[in-house]
């Protein structure tokens, strides 16, 4: 009796892995053994960087708030401290957005916080 090797499932599995490696350079995109390692590593980087992205954006928001605060005669740390003392809760993302899109409104916030 001939050996059944379930070629349909094997081909589907290989296609699924090769599909994840679309756009990879050279043998990293078309040789299965190399593709497996490349896709594994890519998924590790993706997992790590989904978490790092949160930290990166927070630091970007802080930089933007600090730059806008310095234009208004204070610093980020003094402003955040004053906001916490007055229990004004505006998150960093929103503050950074206001600082970039509406500097006049940000100036009013700074004046209200630092009196």
Curated annotation (Swiss-Prot):
Q: Which residues form a coiled coil?
A: none
Q: Where are the transmembrane segments?
A: none
Q: Name one GO molecular function term.
A: rRNA binding
Which GO biological process annotations does it have?
Answer: ribosomal large subunit assembly; translation
Q: Superkingdom, according to UniProt?
A: Bacteria
**Disulfide bond positions:** none
Q: Which UniProt keywords apply?
A: Ribonucleoprotein, Ribosomal protein, RNA-binding, rRNA-binding
Q: Cellular component terms, GO, for this chain's entry?
A: ribonucleoprotein complex; ribosome
Q: Which InterPro entries match?
A: Ribosomal_bL20, RIBOSOMAL_L20_CS, Ribosomal_protein_bL20_C
Note the Gene3D superfamilies from the entry.
Answer: 6.10.160.10, Ribosomal protein L20
**What does this protein do, in the record's words?**
Binds directly to 23S ribosomal RNA and is necessary for the in vitro assembly process of the 50S ribosomal subunit. It is not involved in the protein synthesizing functions of that subunit.
Q: PANTHER family annotated for this entry?
A: 39S RIBOSOMAL PROTEIN L20
- According to its UniProt record, which protein family does this protein belong to? Belongs to the bacterial ribosomal protein bL20 family.
Name of protein: Large ribosomal subunit protein bL20
- Per the UniProt record, the source organism is Chlorobium phaeobacteroides (strain DSM 266 / SMG 266 / 2430)
What gene, per UniProt, encodes this protein? rplT
């Amino acid at each position: 009796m001939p050996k059944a090797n379930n070629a349909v499932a094997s081909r589907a599995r290989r296609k699924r892995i090769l599909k994840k490696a679309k756009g990879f350079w050279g043998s990293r995109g078309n040789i299965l053994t190399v593709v497996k390692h490349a896709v594994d590593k890519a998924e590790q980087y993706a997992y790590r960087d989904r978490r790092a992205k949160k930290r990166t954006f927070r630091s970007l928001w802080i930089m933007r708030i600090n730059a806008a605060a310095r234009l208004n005669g204070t610093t980020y740390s003094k402003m955040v401290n004053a906001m916490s003392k007055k229990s004004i809760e505006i998150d960093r993302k929103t503050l950074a957005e206001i600082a970039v899109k509406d500097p006049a409104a940000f100036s009013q916030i700074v004046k209200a916080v630092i009196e």
